[in-house]
Amino acid sequence: IIRIGTKVPVVLPQRITPKLLRTLKKYQPLWMSIHFTHPDELTPETQAACNQLADSGIPLGSQTVLLKGINDTVNTLRDLFHGLLKIRVRPYYLYQCDPILGSAHFRTTIEKGIEMIEGLRGHTSGYAVPNYVIDAPGGGGKIPLLPDYFQGRTNGQVILRNYERKSFTYPECHEEFSSGGI
């Protein structure tokens, strides 16, 4: 699998030419992760570039960094992710901003990011809810950050909470019933 991470369809959409598309088609399977930050980037030119890529059979996903004061509201992210789905780009990752030199004023708390995911989940299509992750320092990989929907167990029941913070119980799987049968 070839993965291309790029911002080209956003900042230089005219680069998506028939010649480039023919070249990309030669190297399959190929997936493209496009870096989007804000719904204002969904210009007609960007939309056309993404549609051309999708029409060429290239699966498209987005990678978005959560940035304080830029895209750290549920409404902004919802507008971005809905706009992406309309142009066949699946919101894939929402990254916690890395602690790099000069980025402190852009960083949010992890709790803020979880608040964003909770504000999306249950209020929009699941396709519009990306994975919220930290790209762990030192080669630790992407670590998902999830709201705590699993609340515990009691009397053979699992206790869960949904996006509205309502609690539900679900019957625990008992090993003697789950092996060899339906």
Enumerate the language-model features and the residues they cover.
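Conserved AdoMet/S-adenosylmethionine-binding subsite of the radical SAM
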Residues: I1-T124
